[in-house]
Amino acid sequence: MDDGTSNKIDMVAGGTTIMKALVVYDSKFGNTERIAQVIGNALGSSYEVEVLQVGTMVPDPFEGLELLIVGSPTQQFNPTKGIKNFLKSLPSNGLKGIKVAAFDTRLTIEDIKEVAILSFFVRIFGYAAKPIANGLKRKGGELVLPPEGFYVQGMEGPLVEGEFERAEEWARQIIAAQ
């Protein structure tokens, strides 16, 4: 039953408490947003899920939270400034007791191989998901799966065929890891 509030902390359905999950993302061309929505929908079978763009965070989104997933496009081998600021803004041990996971969107291996210097820098600096995961762990979160990357065609996308299905499968793996 909806009591008119947009941010329910827990629901009780048939005597069982539904766990709360939050998917926070930033997106430049819409690809990361689409992956975040797919992940949120897939988690909906086991969680009460909110999917929010990093700049639209609600007050106290972590109250009652059991799972936090953060995603960003890879820009200059890092998460976006918005995601970096979000991670910095979290209090020390602010994610203690919360399961966490991280993902990014990135160029395909084929696109990277076409530019030798890009291949070199990717080998050195990597992608956005790993720094996101490290930031979540530094704030006390418990990483449930290794960081994941989803592929886009070229700099702006679209997503490579099959990435929505991979995102759904990754979300199912997160549920199974609980």
Regions found by a protein language model. Name each.
Residues D3-I18:
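Short, Lys/Arg-enriched N-terminal segments with co-localized hydrophobic residues
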Residues A42, S46-E50, G64-Q178:
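FMN-binding flavodoxin-like domain, especially the glycine-rich phosphate-binding loop
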